[in-house]
């Protein structure tokens, strides 16, 4: 994800579904996604977002599975995103938007598909 084999301005849409919380340098990855997306292209960046955190929690010294599970909620995560994720999108050249798709889904569907009650999906519109 740091060096994708595509030319600049290649994609109209990129779906990055639960990837960024697993990689060491998410800013480098976002910059690379911006490179390969067209102007006004859409990046859907689904991540675990804790709306109670103003700032993303990450600590490079937390390296073993037990501690990562304890602090990040999963052994292979390297951070928990806070509300500053939208600023990270902006810093990489995207115009950030929040999409609350759950308002459009019935309670029955939320239960059927085990969806969280208040998930927000960050979307970035590429600005070039």
Protein language model annotation of sequence segments:
Residues 2-14:
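A short acidic, Gly/Pro-enriched loop at the edge of an enzyme's catalytic core
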Residues 12-24:
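A short SAM/SAH-binding and catalytic strip from SAM-dependent methyltransferases
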Residues 24-38, 42-127:
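S-adenosyl-L-methionine-dependent methyltransferase catalytic module, highlighting the catalytic core
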């Amino acid at each position: 994800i740091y060096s994708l084999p595509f030319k600049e301005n290649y994609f109209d849409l990129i779906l990055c579904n639960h990837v960024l919380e697993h990689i060491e340098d998410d800013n480098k990855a976002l910059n690379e996604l911006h490179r390969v997306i067209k102007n006004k292209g859409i990046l859907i960046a689904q991540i675990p977002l804790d709306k109670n955190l103003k700032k993303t929690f990450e600590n490079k010294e937390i390296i073993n599975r037990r501690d990562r599970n304890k602090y990040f909620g999963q052994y292979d995560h390297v951070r928990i995103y806070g509300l500053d994720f939208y600023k990270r999108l902006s810093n990489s050249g995207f115009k950030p938007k929040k999409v609350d798709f759950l308002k459009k889904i019935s309670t029955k569907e939320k239960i059927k598909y085990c969806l969280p009650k208040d998930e927000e999906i960050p979307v970035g519109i590429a600005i070039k």
